[in-house]
Amino acid sequence: MKKYINMVAEFHTAFNMPDPQDYKQLTQEQYELRHRLLEEENNEYLEACGHDDLVGIADALGDQLYIIYGTILKHGLQDRIEEVFSEIHRSNMSKLGEDGLPIMRGDGKILKGPGYFKPDISKILGA
């Protein structure tokens, strides 16, 4: 993940888009822009899926990753995001049922099993 975050950091530097030293420096305008960019790419993904366009799907997913990595930088999480992701994965795996099988809702959403626990992200961030 760090390789790709560094690539986006290079882009930010080349295009004079400095990343804040503290996530609290991110303005409402800046985080709303990040949200709009992701929303645009989500819509492009949906459209590409509807047209069975694998190139468009790959492009939209790649652009989403690019925006996500940039957003990670904007919030100063580049040094902790892998640990955060691992903790979320650990929590997601705790959703299995007592029999070790997934518990699924009718629409395919995975439900929380009896052993589910929330990810402890505050521990990672020291918050």
Which residues does each PLM region occupy?
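Flexible "arm" and connector segments at domain edges
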Residues: 1-127
